[in-house]
Amino acid sequence: MLEEAGEVFDNMLKASFPLTFIVFLPAVLLLVSPLQAEAAHEFTVYRMQHYDLQGQSYGTRNSVLNTEARTVQADVLSRRCVLMRLADFSFEQYQKALRQSAGAVVIILPPNMAALPQDIVQQFMDIEPEMLSMETQVPVYFAVEDEELLSIYEQTLAASASQGTSSAAEVLLHTATANGFQMVTSGAQSKAVSDWLVTSVEGRLTGLGAEDLPTIAIVAHYDSFGVAPWLSYGADSNGSGVTILLELARLFSRLYTYKRTHAGYNLLFFASGGGKFNYQGTKRWLEDHLDHTDSSLLQDNVAFVLCLDTLGNGDTLHLHVSKPPREGTLQHAFLRELEMIISSQFPEVKFSMVHKKINLAEDTLAWEHERFAIRRLPAFTVSHLESHRSGHRNSILDLRWKVDTQVLARNTRIIAEALTRVIYNLTEKAAPSDLQIFTQQMQVQKEQLDAVMQWLTGQPRAAQLVDKDSSLLSTLEYYMSRYLKDVKFYHVKADKRDPEFVFYDQLKQTMNAYRVKPAIFDLLLALCIAAYLGLSYFAVQNFGLLYKLVQRVSWKPKQQ
Amino acid sequence: MTLFHFGNCFALAYFPYFITYKCSGLSEYNAFWRCVQAGATYLCVQLCKMLFLATFFPTWEGAVGAYDFIGEFMKATVDLADLLGLHLVMSRNAGKGEYKIMVAAMGWATAELVMSRCLPLWVGARGIEFDWKYIQMSIDSNISLVHYMAVAALVWMWTRYDLPTHYRLPVTVLLGLSMYKAFLMDCFVHIFIMGSWTALLLKAVITGVLSLSCLTLFVSLVHGN
């Protein structure tokens, strides 16, 4: 039989040599279609939140990933890494992937979030808390789209979409031409970070007068929260609150430097950490002040605590209280002043008081003032949001462009004017309702607000990322000590035995996308190579024929 | 990708050598050690070439992406040492012309295969990332086997004292062509911006044509007079 095959081959050789020579290589070349070989693509991925709060686990529990990529369109998703783009992301698809026991989910964010349509932004903001509310066993990552990642996504999409609809031959051809991608993270498995310190900064302006002056505390938490810590820039929540706090510190420090304008109130400024984790920083601060020290400003005579939260957008302002202030208290006076200033000077702003009782049955407190209200301190929160449930406060889409500097400046003015009227008791001194204090030399500086905002949103400020030596905190301390006295840090460390909060590491990783081929491709290639080797065996075996052929061809002219 | 893929590439690169050795009758002459000697000569020649290049051709620090035609041409000229090495191998072996040519070419090409392709294949083809270039590299090694046989035959013909004068010119032209083949190919690929597969096909075709002309010359020389 081999001889017969040899004969056929001989005949082929005799017919024309170049033809057979050209048959060998193209046979292999045709089977392997001419694709440009590219190197592995490497990109940064940001892991979804991973933390325990009060004994309950949230977010993704895993960080190691080494699986092949698919898109949701594929039939089988089990143990695959599912790629999704934010533009066509939906919670149903996310759940579908998890139900099919996908190995991992990578959500690709567009490079320019500001250009996203408003409905997609809103939809994603609603999904974020839902994604976090359940514990996810597989790793969930976010990546920012670039050209190569987009090309990987599209190739995976093409491969996933064509599955199951084609014939066997098409599938075979497909395995040779299409690319699969193996997604591999380089980092180790995530583990709990021990002894993590959540830091808060306090500063004060002491009033003029006797020992036990009433104290007004102004509080804003500086940390941000989103579905992925490394992507949480938290511009509106709560970069805007901190910006206003710092601006108020600047304005009142100027008032407090002159004897004539030095008021009889102590002002306590507090930028709290861990605000998104049930206000851990505030909680410890209160414990330190009320339980451990003998005398502190918060112990004796607190007029009220003003919390600032999410104030950088919209034409509404809400005063959130857990108990409506009684007539005759300073709290009530502040509310009245706010109402009056808004109605007389800023008629475009809609103001209302929102009353919500503290629900101790819930896992987390709604607003920061509830921390104070539990300790029986009169407190309220000013925010442009009507409900604490708004997805706005916990979103990675809460970026710089979400904050309008004009609105920020206006809100700063409203709060500053109202505070001043309370502190100097201007209404009882019959000052007109449209008296403007913060104008000209004392005006709110928009450039300053803008610069502080820019600085705050220049880096992710998730509580897991701001460690006690971070530049964010040292800059904050520096800024506050320019205007305030006794600036100091407060650190919270979770209890070792029964930790109230546990953070996990490996939140930012490098992911590699390796171009791979399915196993069937290797088999196919092995067959082709075997065929080629067989052909070359016959070619070498029958080299004599070629030799004779050449001999005949080259001798002919001489015989003539 | 996997070990299987490495096996594929390895088979594609090495089996044609094995087949050629077994089927060309070299194994019957006990030519294995002679082939190893040829390989050793290859190593020596490459070492000398490298020393020479490192001494007289400093690394060209031109713009990135530009092609240094003159430098590459000079480097190709250094490949003259390969021809000398082949001649050396053949002059130390006694025997028929075909036998000498086959021993020199096999030893030479196998040494090149082991030295320059074994390691990249082992490192690259087993990695996670799939890349066609390892398959291409294996095919390329097959082409270079044919190439070295042709070159060895040309060197043998050129160094024969009884070479008829009208053969001198074509043999010299072919020798020059095969010596500068890699350089010419590089230029061609660079100018026409060819893909790696097209370049490989072109290389196969050029090598095929060269070896065929060489075979024609050889046949007419051996059987002509």
Swiss-Prot record, chain B:
GO cellular component, one term: plasma membrane
Superkingdom classification of source: Eukaryota
Alphabetical UniProt keywords: Cell membrane, Endoplasmic reticulum, Membrane, Transmembrane, Transmembrane helix
GO BP terms in the entry: multi-pass transmembrane protein insertion into ER membrane; protein localization to nuclear inner membrane
Segments traversing the membrane: 1-21, 35-58, 69-90, 101-126, 132-157, 167-189, 197-218
GO molecular function: ribosome binding
Membrane topology: Multi-pass membrane protein
Location, primary (coarse class): endoplasmic reticulum
InterPro entries on file: TMEM147 (IPR019164)
Cytoplasmic-side segments: 22-34, 91-100, 158-166, 219-225
Intracellular or extracellular location(s): Endoplasmic reticulum membrane; Cell membrane
Residues in the Lumenal compartment per record: 59-68, 127-131, 190-196
Family: Belongs to the TMEM147 family.
Record text on subunit structure and interactions: Component of the multi-pass translocon (MPT) complex.
Entry protein name: BOS complex subunit TMEM147
